[in-house]
């Protein structure tokens, strides 16, 4: 019914129905889709906007401030009481008029500082609402860096550098609205130490370590001392901080997150 009010071509509506009822293959097994649609499907965001356009109009008619991305929506009110009242009134509209089911587990009343939305969290500064990266998003980012800089993943240096650069560019561009200079500064220092540890393990033999340290500009006796050290990779990564400098790591292709963030913000 909602689709028919927006889309006048019956053939298109028929095609959409066929798509929704086509089923999915999960782990090699066909499963029927009787409710909803496959997550991540190319039609999902388009249908979300068609279906929820009615919700947008209703919220505007009621004078609410809100933000919506696909089916993820936040409605802003001045007090907890008015928020609870709005929630109580809007759910019947969504379920009764749009025939959509509201996920009660994900629907909540909370202060904006306690909310996670599209990976962001929010805080107030000088009377304005500011963005920061949510702690869960930070944890996911660090887990990805751990994966890319794992000393035992068997990845070639060229492939690791390429994947690391791709991840940094994508992640920073997504979260560029957030205030995160300090976060990225600390993350860069931690990531560079992990990268140094990767190279130290790759050098393996004492003579290889000595040769590489000399190539980095270390004098004979110091290079010999470090090459013979029995300290672990993580400890040695800290010792190598000055000789295996940040500039060298950047030249290898490991783009600093903070530097890229500042460039993105300027543009």
Regions found by a protein language model. Give the residues of each.
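Catalytic cores of large soluble enzymes that bind and process phosphate-bearing ligands
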Residues: 8, 43, 47, 82, ...
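Short hinge/gating elements
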Residues: 33-38, 150-151, 174
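Conserved polymerase palm-domain catalytic core
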Residues: 1-114
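A conserved non-catalytic segment of reverse transcriptases
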Residues: 21, 92, 97-162, 166-169
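Alpha-helix initiation and N-capping motif
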Residues: 9-13, 87, 138, 142, ...
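Short, conserved aromatic-histidine micro-motifs
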Residues: 63-69, 141-150, 201-203
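Extended C-terminal regions of large enzymes
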Residues: 199, 203-267
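Non-catalytic, peripheral interaction segments enriched in hydrophobic/basic residues
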Residues: 160-206, 210-214
């Amino acid at each position: 019914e909602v689709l028919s009010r927006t889309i006048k071509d019956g053939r298109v509506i028929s095609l959409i129905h066929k798509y929704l009822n086509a089923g999915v293959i999960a782990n090699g097994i066909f499963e029927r889709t009787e409710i909803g649609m496959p997550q991540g499907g190319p039609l999902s965001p388009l249908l979300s906007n068609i279906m929820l356009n009615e919700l947008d109009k209703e919220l505007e008619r009621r004078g609410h401030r809100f933000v919506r991305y696909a089916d993820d929506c936040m409605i802003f009110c001045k007090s907890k009481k008015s928020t609870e009242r709005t929630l109580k009134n809007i759910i019947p509209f969504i379920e009764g008029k749009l025939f959509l089911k509201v996920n009660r587990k994900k629907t909540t009343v909370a202060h904006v500082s306690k909310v996670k939305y599209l990976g962001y969290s929010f805080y107030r500064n000088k009377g304005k609402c500011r963005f920061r990266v949510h702690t869960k998003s930070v944890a996911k980012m660090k887990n990805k860096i751990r994966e890319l800089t794992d000393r035992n993943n068997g990845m070639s240096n060229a492939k690791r550098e390429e994947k690391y650069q791709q991840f940094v560019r994508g992640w920073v561009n997504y979260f560029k609205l957030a205030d995160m200079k300090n976060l990225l500064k600390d993350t860069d220092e931690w990531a560079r130490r992990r990268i140094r540890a990767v190279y130290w393990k790759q050098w393996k033999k004492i003579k290889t370590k000595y040769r590489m340290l000399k190539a980095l500009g270390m004098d004979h006796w110091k290079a010999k001392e470090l090459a013979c050290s029995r300290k672990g990779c993580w400890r040695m990564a800290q010792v190598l901080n000055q000789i295996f400098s940040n500039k060298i790591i950047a030249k290898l292709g490991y783009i600093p997150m903070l530097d890229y963030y500042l460039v993105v913000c300027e543009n």
